[in-house]
Amino acid sequence: AGKKYGSAYPMGARMMSGNSVHHQQLERDLSAFVSKEDSILLNYGYQGVLSVIDALVDRKDVIVYDSECHACIIDGLRLHIGKRFVYPHNNIENLKDQLERATKIVKETGGGILVITEGVFGMSGNMGALSSIVELKKDYNFRLFVDDAHGFGTMGKTGAGCGEEQGVQDEIDLFFSTFAKSMASIGAFVSGNADIIDNLRYKIRSQIFAKSLPMPLVVGNIKRLSLIKNSPEFKNKLWEIV
């Protein structure tokens, strides 16, 4: 791909001259792998998460997040001009308290609640309490955003991440991962329902106002994802070493 397209092609943002069938193929492959309707490619994980959070919420919305979320999430939260509440790491009882507070606010503002956590927390290595958080959807109305940068490719039967590992993949509204961990590459993606992802395509500033992911990385990531899907021995070897 590098010889064919060079290191910079395509030039321009995805919405302009930066789209290609390869970008679209990678998005379809990622969506199928993590069991979501649609996906959007991001140039970098840090920049991508920050921009996704900014695009998802406005001043009427409330964000509730785990205290050990990655710095990229924290910086995304700093852009939020509405309310945000933190709960102690994996403390579900305190999360309930924060959801109660958030629910009262959005009843007045007409907004929504976004809960943000991680699949595998990078500093501690433990998993987010995804199954317990999903249970709370029975009593509270919120969307769940999971940064599974460390779980993608390493957790779950197929490597689809911690949602698959805990049996709640379908209940994750927005699934994010970078390509920098299990795929040893550059770039990232976020997956979810088609209407949410389509909305992001027109609102996510880090992609609208930047050139798209270069073709050698896109084609390479298609191959690397194929290796994750079709060569489980790599994941199995990782766990043997661990």
Positions of predicted regions on the chain:
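Short, structured coil segments at secondary-structure junctions
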Residues: R59, L79-I81, Y140, E171
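Active-site phosphate-binding strand-loop segment of PLP-dependent enzymes
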Residues: F85, H89-V146
